[in-house]
């Protein structure tokens, strides 16, 4: 009787410890992969990722962040909802325009590459895509992907990117819905 109580108690403690550890691991993975520690958005941006809702006076904010000694690193991003398509299908995606150097200081996507490189080899409009999206659209390195989205003027835009790298994070949803490209290529 006492042995079964002790075994039950240890089993319960083990289960709780395991759940807490998995929760911590999942949270750390999300923060390091794509959330980062803090995000600053226009108050209305999160409602539907509308590109019209951008931060005003971005240069002033950049200056403040660069000169704040308590901030280790930061990265500006342009985030747009859109559609990715290939000859093998299409998928709703979130397009993330980044500066590769500053982004590598706040996320670990550059270390999550399973194929290709992190903005090193393709000079004209490279893209990084998640492994799940690559599988769904049957994409590989150096293959073309077309992205369609609405710009800040309400006009539909279509751009062609070339897959430079394929990443895999702990989140298959993130890997299936996100594409990284250079911010300068969105201008």
Located regions from the model:
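Short, charged, solvent-exposed linker or helix-capping segments at domain edges/interfaces
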Residues: 51, 105-109, 158, 175
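Short beta-strand boundary microenvironments
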Residues: 96-137
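N-terminal signal-anchor/signal peptide hydrophobic helix marking the start
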Residues: 1-9
């Amino acid at each position: 009787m006492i042995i079964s109580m002790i075994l039950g108690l240890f089993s319960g403690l083990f289960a709780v410890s395991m759940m807490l550890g998995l929760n911590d691991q999942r949270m750390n993975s999300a923060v390091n992969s794509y959330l980062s520690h803090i995000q600053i958005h226009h108050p209305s941006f999160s409602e539907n990722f509308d590109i019209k809702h951008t931060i005003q006076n971005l240069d002033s904010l950049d200056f403040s962040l660069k000169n704040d000694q308590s901030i280790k690193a930061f990265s500006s991003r342009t985030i747009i909802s859109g559609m990715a398509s290939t000859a093998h299908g299409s998928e709703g995606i979130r397009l993330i325009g980044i500066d590769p150097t500053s982004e590598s200081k706040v996320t670990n996507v550059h270390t999550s590459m399973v194929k290709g490189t992190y903005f090193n080899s393709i000079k004209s409009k490279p893209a990084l895509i998640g492994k799940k999206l690559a599988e769904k659209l049957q994409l590989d390195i150096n293959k073309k992907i077309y992205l369609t989205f609405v710009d800040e003027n309400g006009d539909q835009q279509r751009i062609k990117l070339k897959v430079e790298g394929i990443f895999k994070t702990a989140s298959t949803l993130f890997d299936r819905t996100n594409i990284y490209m250079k911010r300068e290529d969105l201008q």
